[in-house]
Design a protein with these regions (language model features):
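Cullin-RING E3 adaptor/co-adaptor recruitment helices
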Residues: 2-132, 139-141, 398, 426, ...
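Extracellular leucine-rich repeat
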Residues: 99-116, 125-143, 152-170, 178-198, ...
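Short, solvent-exposed loop/turn at the beta-strand->alpha-helix junction
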Residues: 110-120, 140-147, 167-174, 195-202, ...
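Recurring C-terminal helix/loop segment of individual leucine-rich repeat
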Residues: 124-127, 148-154, 175-181, 203-209, ...
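Short amphipathic alpha-helical interaction elements and helix-loop-helix interfaces
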Residues: 141, 168, 186, 210, ...
């Protein structure tokens, strides 16, 4: 047996002593930042326990770089305590980690004795691990922990994205803003839901100028008095500070930037910026803004690609100016203006924007809301002239069938528009629209963003078409019952991509059977939402339909009755699903098990699911759902799942996300057992294709070719990637390679029954038999 060096007992004691001293020092530091919350000794005891659970790797420095940081192996330990803050640590991108809220509607810091554990870990992760790139904080932070957070940000060296929510603590926020200015690698700062006094803008402006890497900025709302000279001065100084952000490409804010005192300065910033490509402004009625100066500035900055004016109700002069600027702009690709509402005090005329469509500009997408049907003739005249625009969205009050007829006849003469979407609050002429689309030959090019409500109209529309791609039916307020045969017509829609159904009464057996048949036979349906009561027998049929589905990527189910056989079938369906990545199972009735306390085995075996909400305990708020049926179910189902179950679900999702990242890395060249095992688990599903398309920006056929090539590589180099050999198998003294191309076909026959997880590596300390004729060849 070969000789092995071992640490002397004194060396082990020295290491343990040093680690203990380091933990004591860190515990004292945390206690100093949060006086009165706990004691340094209690914090030390907790950290020492964490160190033990991570095999003494807690104190190890961040190992990010070519290899994965060691915190990837201990996510369960960290999340066991971060969940006390309603937060989680997960691998957001390959090799990059982030801290995210679990339930953003819950305040943080309610139980101080427990929360200090979570805050200690959060502080440590931000201070010591540059692989943590994202921090999205929950809604409210207890003031006792704000110093600790500020200290963590000051000491951080890796954050690229920071999001703050609903911060209202005015005194402590200056420390946080100061700390933000020290984040040397920050690329995205989101303060959209923060509410600040004007005086804090000076500190924020100074901090932003110190971050040379900042690319995306969402500004906070400001509690400003437009008659207060001091407030206006703060806004003006902040606008000047924006010029000190040389890489700022995306800017989002409400219109406090456009008040008369700072409007000219902001327009100057927009005009001169060489990096700004996307500008989003949200109108607030508290401020009187000057849009015209902004529009002129936009016209002089050809780098700008997207302009969003959310909630702006433009007068005729401003609308004409905006349309003229957009028409002459050589870089603008996306324009959004107005807002859609069932009631408005005045409307945007819309004529100038309609004429813009007919001028064949570089604009690829226009979203216009806030007008009436009076501008439909102008749009109908302009659309046939356009040869460049690809998407158009309109939110116009008082649309009816004759207006749609005029519009669709014009759309039929247009070749470039791929999709036109109309925003509606509700509509009762579904069948008429279906007939018009068929008559004008515009199938697949029109979408109406509203639910169908009338049962008879719903059935007629389904019957008179076979090319619908999206169906949303909500009969909660309708007096009549849905005709039992209505859903049967869905079987003829071979291009159906999205289906959403809500009913006021338990679904009838015939309807359930039709839906089940659709689910089990469709190859096109990707998203399905079912929100209706279902008896045990109806639920059984529906679950059987789901079990036969091979296309859904997004599934949401509410109010079904799931007995033991159906529950078993449901979990088995999830085990075998290779397409489903988003799952919502809420307020289901499990008569045999009123409370879920462990994650079912079938669900645990699913490696494709990335987002899930399963039997989460609802809040007692009566307005969580908007009809009596939902409140009845809420009362019936008091407790739906235990914290252990919910933690298990989150663990599964984190595991699957990391598995997907390892598989992506395998396809892009990373090698080793960890990567090969992950690739083998998810290579047959659609999630890997989508992840690679996002990572590599390549077409789907090329991505599938990459996956096929990686599969062939793994087949050929299985023994190496599984860790059996280093490079090849050598037999005897001749050095001849035993496994070569000669027996490759035979090897493939064996390989089809063999997975990476079937190979059990020799535990550390056990040596190979010296009499073995095989040896490792590098």
């Amino acid at each position: 047996m070969p000789f092995r060096l071992r640490k002397r007992p004194s060396e082990q004691i020295t290491t343990a002593t040093k680690n203990g001293e380091k933990l004591h020092q860190y515990a004292a530091c945390v206690n100093q930042q949060c006086p009165g919350v706990s004691t340094a000794e209690d914090i030390f005891s907790f950290l020492d326990a964490v160190d033990g659970r991570t095999n003494a790797e807690f104190l190890a420095p961040c190992s990010a770089g070519p290899r994965l940081c060691h915190i990837a192996d201990h996510l369960s330990v960290y999340n066991d305590f971060l969940q006390l803050l309603d937060m989680e640590l997960k691998e957001d991108k390959p090799g990059e980690f982030g801290l995210f809220p679990l339930k953003v509607h819950y305040p943080v810091g309610a139980d101080q004795r427990s929360c200090i554990k979570g805050w200690s870990l959060l502080h440590w992760l931000l201070r010591e691990h540059c692989c943590v790139k994202t921090l999205i904080l929950p809604w409210l932070i207890d003031s006792k922990y704000q110093r600790l957070l500020s200290d963590a940000l000051h000491l951080n060296s890796g954050l690229k994205k920071l999001t703050l929510h609903n911060w209202q603590a005015k005194r402590a926020f200056k420390d946080i803003i100061s700390a933000i200015g020290t984040l040397a690698q920050l690329e995205e700062l989101d303060m959209e839901l923060v509410y600040l006094p004007p005086s804090a803008l000076g500190c924020l402006g100074t901090a932003l100028q110190r971050i040379s890497t900042l690319k995306t900025l969402k500004l906070p709302s400001v509690d400003m008095d437009v008659c207060n000279a001091s407030h206006l001065s703060c806004i003006t100084q902040f606008v000047k500070a924006l010029k000190g952000c040389p890489k700022l490409a995306v800017l989002s804010s409400d219109n406090f930037l456009l008040v008369p005192a700072s409007g000219e300065g902001f327009a100057e910033f927009v005009m001169e910026s060489s990096s700004l490509t996307k500008l989003s402004l949200c109108h607030s009625p508290r401020y009187h803004s000057k849009e015209c100066a902004l529009f002129m500035a936009v016209g002089k900055n050809n780098n700008l690609e997207e302009l969003c004016l959310d909630g702006f109700m433009l007068y005729e002069e401003a609308e004409r100016l905006l349309a003229e600027v957009a028409a002459q702009h050589t870089g603008l690709r996306y324009l959004e203006v107005g807002f859609y509402d069932g009631f408005r005090e005045w409307e945007i005329n819309g004529t100038a924007l309609a004429n813009l469509v007919g001028r064949n500009t570089g604009l690829r997408e226009l979203v216009f809301s806030g007008g009436t049907v009076s501008c439909i003739p102008e749009f109908a005249e302009a659309i046939p002239k356009n040869a460049t625009m690809q998407k158009l969205t309109l939110g116009l009050l008082d649309m009816d069938v004759p207006n749609y007829r005029v519009f669709l006849q014009a759309l039929a003469r247009n070749q470039s528009l791929q999709l036109v979407t109309f925003k509606e609050s509700s509509y009762y002429y579904f069948n008429d629209i279906v007939l018009l689309v068929r008559e004008t030959g515009t199938e697949g090019r029109l979408a109406i963003d509203a639910d169908v409500h009338d049962p008879q109209d719903f059935e007629k529309g389904l019957k008179n078409s076979t090319s619908l791609t999206r169906v949303a039916y909500s009969n909660r307020e309708a007096a009549g019952l849905t005709p039992p045969g209505a859903f049967r017509h869905l079987l003829h829609h071979r291009c159906l991509h999205e289906l959403r159904i809500g009913l006021p009464r338990p679904i009838e057996m015939e309807s359930a059977t039709s839906l089940a048949l659709l689910l089990s036979t469709t190859s096109s349906l990707r998203c399905a939402t079912f929100e209706f009561l279902a008896t045990a027998s109806s639920s059984r049929i529906l679950v059987e339909g789901l079990a036969g589905n091979r296309s859904l990527t997004d599934l949401s189910v509410s109010f079904w009755t799931i007995e033991a056989p159906e529950a078993d079938l449901l979990w088995r369906m999830l085990r075998s699903s290779r397409t489903l990545k988003t799952l919502t199972l809420e307020l289901l009735d499990f008569p045999q098990s009123p409370m879920l306390d462990r994650v079912p085995e079938g669900l645990l075996q699913n490696h494709y699911l990335l987002r899930a909400a399963i039997q989460r305990n609802p809040t007692p708020s009566l307005d969580m759902y908007h009809d009596g049926i939902h409140r009845q179910v809420l009362k019936k189902l008091n407790v739906l799942s235990t914290p252990t179950f919910q933690f298990g679900v989150q663990e599964l999702l984190r595991r699957n996300l990391s598995t997907l990242h390892r598989a992506v890395q395998f396809v892009t060249g990373s090698r080793g057992r960890r990567y090969a095992e992950a690739f083998e688990r998810v290579s047959k599903g659609s999630t890997l294709v989508e992840a690679l398309k996002k990572a590599l920006a390549e077409p789907e056929d090329k991505i599938k070719g990459r996956i096929a090539s990686s599969s062939r590589y793994l087949d050929e180099h299985f023994l190496v990637e599984a860790g059996v050999v280093r490079a090849a198998v050598v037999c005897g003294e001749s050095g001849r390679v035993q496994l070569d191309r000669i027996g490759f076909d035979n090897w493939l026959c064996i390989r089809q029954y063999l997975k990476v997880t079937d190979i059990v590596l020799t535990p550390v300390g056990l040596l190979a038999d010296p009499s073995s004729s095989g040896s490792l060849q590098d």
